[in-house]
Structures are given as C-alpha cells and as structure tokens.
Design a protein with these regions (language model features):
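Alpha-helical transmembrane segments and their helix-start/interface "positive-inside/aromatic belt" motifs
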Residues: 69-82, 150-160
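Alpha-helical transmembrane segments in multi-pass membrane proteins
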Residues: 82-137
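Transmembrane helix-loop-helix hairpins at the membrane interface
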Residues: 164-167, 190-296
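Juxtamembrane helix-loop-helix connectors linking adjacent transmembrane helices
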Residues: 105-114, 139-212, 230
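Cys/His-rich metal-coordination motifs, chiefly Zn-binding "fingers/knuckles"
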Residues: 1-40
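Alpha-helical transmembrane segments of polytopic integral membrane proteins
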Residues: 93, 125, 129, 133-136, ...
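Alpha-helical transmembrane segments of multipass membrane proteins
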Residues: 89-93, 120-125, 162-173, 285, ...
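N-terminal juxtamembrane cytosolic/stromal segments of multi-pass membrane proteins
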Residues: 16, 23, 37-80
Length: 296
C-alpha cells in the first residue's frame, strides 16, 4: 500500500501511522537491514506533527523511539495518565503556594501566582519527562522544541496571526456574553493584585508571560496533542487537546475562548512544526493581559 486509505497521502516506508492524518497503516513496509549491509545503524530524527523525519542523528536500533514522520513514542494512555498526574499535582501546588503567600503580607496574591506557576512548571516537566521523553534520544525534538520549518520572519508573522485571531475571538465571545447578560459565562475579572508593584512586576511577567507559555505549550501541544494524533488523527487531536487546555483553566467564563485559542495554537504547531511560535503567541497574550491589569 503506497497511500494512506484515510486521506490519500503517500506513505513513508516503515511508517506505522500516516504523517498527515495519523491513521494507522496496515502491513508496514520493512526497511532493509543496515546491519546486514555493513552500514552503521541509523534512525530518523523523531518528527513533530507534520514535519518529516530527518536522518541526521545516529542511534542504536534499540534506542530509536520512532522512524515514522509525525510519530512520538507515547500514546493516549500516557497522555491520559499525564493529565491526571498534573491535575492531582494542583492540590499540593495550591497548598504550598497559599502557605508561602500567607507569609508575603500585602503581596500575597502576586506571590501565590509566582509560586504556583513555577511549581506547576516543575510538575509538568516531571510528568512529560517520565511519561514521554525519558531515555529517548533528542527529547527536545519530540516535544517540538526544534527549529521552525519556515524562516524566522514568516514564523513570527504566523504567531502574530494566531495571537490576533485569539484576541479577536475573545472580544467576540465577550460581546456575545454581554449581549445576553450572562454572568456565569463572563470572563472573570482578575485584579491587579496578581502582579508585584513597581520594578518587581518583572517577576510577574517572567512567571506569566515566559514560564507559563513554555510549560503549557510543551504539555498541551508538545505532549498531549502529539500523543493523541496516532489514535485520533490530527483534527480530533486538535479538538481534544484544546478541550483539555480549556478545562485546565478551571473557569466557565474562559472555557470557550481558551478552547478556541487552543485550536489556533495546535494549528500553528501543525503548520510550523515547532513549539516556539506557539510560545510566542501564548506569551504575547499573557503579557498583554498582565500589562492591562498593571497599567490600565
């Protein structure tokens, strides 16, 4: 079989899943044994969603996590377990953050935000490392932390496009909610107390507009989205990962806009083959939100 029966994309030799839609391919074609030809054992560089694998790293055959384009070594089971573990970690993270915040006096809210962001980053890093990339060659590439497919200028423009689309959808959603005068589904009003005052606001920006975008994009796009593609295909994986991303924000008022943002970020990751444009778009939105709370 030379083409995917689901979407018609030409298959790659030995690929277990279609590089475009993630459909499972039957009767994979075996590659000739390189060992039998007296050649060093090589494996293709594991690819991000929709990015063809490249044979630029030499691994032992037992170490190579995947040679199929768009395939990662973890699957839906690890994704579900990872989501559960991160959710459970919210309990100790919240307890520690509030305990530390109680010692900060008038800056308790800002301290709680800063501490919780960094503790969640550690939690996510541990979960992703253990369930996804532990003992895997080039783990950063498996998570999309690789160079972008397009030139820098085009990648930045795509990120800005995703940011603009997210902001526009959020404005439209807020207008619709206000039209129906629904307090339940209105975005929550977050006070300026979440930020440190004066020059110390740098630490709030560092937490919310740098650490949060990196860790969330690695988890929701690099780990969850990529891990769901082989089982559900790209479109369903985008929807499911966006739903998880939205649910993690624990507020009915942002459920819809965050879901739409999650779709845009998954599409951006799919388009660029790298997490970094997603981080840029995510960071821009968070930085704008913090700046409005501090300076507006």
């Amino acid at each position: 079989m030379n083409y995917c029966p689901n979407c018609g994309t030409q298959r790659i030799e030995s690929a277990a899943y279609c590089p475009r839609c993630g459909h499972a391919l039957s009767n994979p074609v075996s590659q000739p044994s390189q060992e039998n030809q007296g050649m060093p054992v090589t494996a293709e560089m594991p690819a991000t969603p929709d990015m063809p694998a490249t044979p630029d790293v030499i691994w032992g055959a037992e170490e190579a996590p995947s040679t199929a384009a768009g395939q990662v070594p973890w699957r839906g089971g690890q994704v579900v377990l990872g989501i559960i573990l991160v959710l459970v970690s919210l309990i100790p993270v919240t307890g520690i953050a509030f305990a530390v915040g109680a010692l900060a006096g008038r800056y308790d809210d800002a301290t709680i935000v800063w501490v919780s962001v960094h503790l969640m980053a550690i939690s996510i890093a541990m979960v992703v490392w253990r369930l996804g990339v532990h003992k895997r060659p080039a783990p950063w590439r498996l998570l999309g932390l690789n160079p972008m497919r397009y030139p820098l200028a085009k990648s930045v423009l795509l990120a800005l496009g995703a940011l603009g689309g997210s902001l526009l959808l959020t404005v439209i959603y807020s207008a619709v909610v206000n039209l129906f005068n629904s307090d339940t589904f209105s975005p929550p009003d977050i006070g300026g107390e979440i930020a440190f005052p004066g020059a110390a606001a740098f630490f709030t920006f560092q937490a919310v507009a740098l650490v949060t975008p990196i860790t969330e994009e690695v988890f929701f796009r690099g780990f969850v989205f990529s891990g769901l593609i082989p089982r559900f295909g790209v479109a369903k994986a985008m929807v499911l990962s966006a739903l998880v991303f939205s649910a993690f924000h624990l507020s009915l008022g942002v459920l819809v806009p965050v879901f739409l943002t999650g779709l845009l970020l998954a599409l951006l990751y799919r388009k660029t083959g790298s997490i970094w444009p997603c981080v840029l778009a995510h960071a821009g939105q968070n930085a704008l939100a913090v700046a409005l709370k501090i300076y507006a």
